[in-house]
Design a protein with these regions (language model features):
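Active-site-proximal, substrate-binding regions of enzyme catalytic domains
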Residues: 2-95, 102-106, 111-113
Length: 116
């Protein structure tokens, strides 16, 4: 099964469209990072938590040394810590990235990561 890492942009857009459940109907194992989850506001987090509890959404929590590597990652200024955490995880587990964020998409492409 393919693995994809999502950013907050995907969750926010799908929640606004009331399509979040469809993300978990595709044949892809979905991961995100704790940093991305912490970026969501309460209402968004409540909707995403259902998929965390049902183990359809996997949350990766970085070690302190991994967080240090993420902070030191050379990346465009437009990328947040959360964005860089998505790239770091995708590289480490050889996964694709799901994002609608243009700066993140461009950076992923430069890193030879599959991005949709």
């Amino acid at each position: 099964m393919k693995i994809a890492i999502t950013d907050a942009n995907i969750f926010i857009d799908l929640i606004k469209l009331q399509w979040l459940g469809y993300l978990f109907c595709i044949d892809i194992e979905i991961y995100t990072t704790l940093e991305v989850i912490n970026e969501l506001i309460d209402d968004q987090l409540e909707r995403v938590t259902i998929f965390i509890q049902s183990r359809q959404l996997n949350i990766y929590s970085f070690s302190s040394s991994e967080l240090e590597q993420i902070m030191q990652m050379a990346a465009p200024a437009a990328l947040t810590m959360q964005d860089k955490s998505v790239v770091f995880l995708a590289k480490n587990i050889q996964a694709g990235v799901l994002s609608g964020d243009n700066p993140l998409r461009k950076f992923c492409a430069k890193q030879n990561l599959e991005v949709k």
